[in-house]
Amino acid sequence: LSLKRTLVGLFRSHEGTSDRAKEPALKTRYYNLTKDKGWEEVSSTLKKIPGYKVLHEVQSVGEIILEKKTAFGRTLDITVSVLNTSPSRCAVDIYSASRGSLGDLGANYRVIMRLYDSLDKKLGKHKLD
């Protein structure tokens, strides 16, 4: 974890991925899977990660809402979006926000990296660069 990430985390209590992210690690992930197959794989993978609780799933809009408690007792609200980009391709974006007013010291960034790492392990053979 870089010093810059920690400094940003002093003030910011959210992090998200997108196509336009300046940092490569925060770019949207694309997989060579239909949206339905991508949804199944992402949903089942997220349910198996210790420390994360799936609160809500809305397959029609491709959103999975998770919650994670940090070691310091803060709660992170995480939204994972599985989007259709073509008939045989889907995209996965993650948004994580801390409850409370103080910065997260990079916790949301680490959560996104952990979730993407788990998804890449499970879906690596389908990943597109």
Model-found features: residue ranges?
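Ser/Thr-rich, low-complexity intrinsically disordered terminal regions
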Residues: 1-129
